[in-house]
Each structure stands twice: as C-alpha cells, then as structure tokens.
Regions:
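Ferredoxin-reductase
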Residues: 39-118
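Gly/Ser/Thr-enriched, mixed-charge loops and adjacent short helices
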Residues: 111-167
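Short, glycine-/Ser/Thr-/acidic-enriched flexible segments
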Residues: 7-9, 14-16, 53, 81-82, ...
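An N-terminal, well-structured beta->alpha segment
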Residues: 1-63, 150-167
Length: 167
C-alpha cells in the first residue's frame, strides 16, 4: 500500500507486494497528481533513480515509461545512484518531483519506492495524502505502461561530477 514516503514491501505477485503493477499504480497515481498540481506549467519533470537491489533497475525503467506516457519529462539515471544524489538531481534540474527505487536498510527480499518533492525531500503534507488518494484511485487498466522515449533523458556522469563538486 502506498503510504507517506512511498511503498516498501517484499517483492512478489499480489497487491500487497512490490511488483510491476504496484509500482505502476504508484507511478500512475503520482503522475496524475503532478499533472493536476502543475496543470498550468508547460513542462513537468521528474528524476528517477535506483539502487542495486533485485528488480530496482526494472522498476525504475517501468516508472520512467509511465511518467513519460503521462507527458512528464524524465531524467533517468543510467545506473544505480545513492539517494542523496537523486535528491540533488531533482533540485539541479528544477524538477517538480522524483522517485528512488530502494528498500534502504530492509532485507534483500524487499524493495521500495520513495517519492520526493521539488525540494529533494520526501513528500510531506499536504502532498503526501493527496498522492495517496490518487494512487488509491488507480486500477490496473489505468496504468500507462507505453512510454514516450522522447521524454526520457538518460543522465549519469555529468550529474555525478556536479554532485561530487557540491559535496
């Protein structure tokens, strides 16, 4: 279940597990919220990062496809990155939001989906509950899995350099 900060759970089949459908619903709900919240903005953008856990890169790519299918520009890291760099990249690119696929300190059978706002911090009130409401409205048939490759920009070493210079 999507809660404050995102999702976290054991990977596997079912609505109470981390899989392409629960990650897809979370991303579709966040996309819906961003499109409502920033309806007057010409370009909405997000950063997508991930860690080294099983399926993290897969969940990141699926999320990038869903964001882009909803008209949202995606800055997708080319490989795993630490959470602080994902937060930095959100601010660096002037994005409205971002996600990081990571289960942090949890055991290896877990994965997670952390949502961040435009300041690079985890989503807080009132956005957290509004995003949860949007995620809870999503059905499997609502999820737009067919990405728009023109809206996905792969990022990597160029961001690493700026990030490391700032630390």
């Amino acid at each position: 279940e999507f809660g404050t900060g995102g999702l976290r759970g054991i990977m596997g089949a079912g609505t109470n597990r981390m899989n392409i459908y629960t990650v897809g619903a979370a991303t579709q709900g966040l996309s819906n919220y961003l499109n409502k919240c920033f309806a007057g903005k010409k370009d909405i953008s997000v950063v997508v990062g991930h860690d080294c856990r099983n399926n993290s890169d897969k969940f990141a790519k699926i999320s990038a496809d869903i964001f882009s299918a909803n008209g949202i520009k995606v800055y997708l890291f080319d490989d795993l990155r630490p959470t602080p760099e994902v937060s930095f990249a959100i601010r660096h690119f002037g994005c409205q939001s971002g996600i990081n696929i990571t289960a942090s300190h949890n055991p290896r059978e877990y994965n997670g989906y952390k949502a961040y706002w435009d300041d690079g911090a985890q989503v807080l009130a009132p956005h957290d509950t509004a995003i949860i409401d949007e995620v809870n409205k999503v059905t499997v048939t609502d999820i737009k899995f067919n990405g728009n490759k023109d809206l996905i920009q792969i990022i990597g070493k160029e961001v690493d350099k700026v990030y490391l210079d700032m630390v």
